[in-house]
A protein has these predicted regions:
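Non-transmembrane, membrane-proximal soluble domains of secreted or membrane proteins
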Residues: 2-7, 11-150
Length: 150
């Protein structure tokens, strides 16, 4: 009898602890974006199944969506910052990293970056994160798809 209670208590404790340390999952309303640093520029591409949708230096996401940014670099180690959202990470060749977040309010946020080579590239590595309502996001995606097919 004591053995069963102990087993149940241990199982419950393990489940509670794993819930605390498990990474937040990407939900149904998720946006996956690959950001690639190359020389002095960030390039964004939405990961949509088997295809990528390139969008340049601007990333749009709907308010409240789970967002996963996959960072990598083709050339140097690069710094990626979204200071208004408290996000920062590094992109390195052959070493992808991820940032996950949920943007709670609409707005246009500055993406800042810098190559870690000592030369100033702030303006060239700048980009934008646009957080908007779902209808505006879908309209923007449709516009990007039309542009990529031309």
């Amino acid at each position: 009898m004591a053995w069963n209670r102990t087993s149940v208590a241990c199982s419950a404790l393990c489940a509670a602890l794993s819930a605390c340390v498990a990474p937040r999952s990407i939900g149904v309303d998720a946006v996956d974006v690959r950001l690639v640093a190359e020389d002095t520029t960030w390039r964004a591409a939405y990961l949509t199944g088997q295809q990528e949708l390139p969008t340049g230096r601007e990333v749009h996401v709907p308010v409240g969506a789970d967002v996963r940014l996959v960072l990598t670099s083709r050339t140097y180690i690069s710094d990626f910052r979204l200071p208004e959202l408290g996000l920062r990470d590094f992109a390195a060749p052959d070493l992808p990293s991820e940032l996950r977040f949920r943007a709670a309010r609409a707005g246009r946020y500055d993406v800042r970056g810098d190559e870690l080579c000592g030369r100033p590239h702030t303006e060239k590595t700048r980009g934008w994160l646009v957080v908007e309502d779902a209808a505006s996001f879908q309209a923007w995606i449709r516009k990007q798809r039309r542009g990529s097919q031309q």
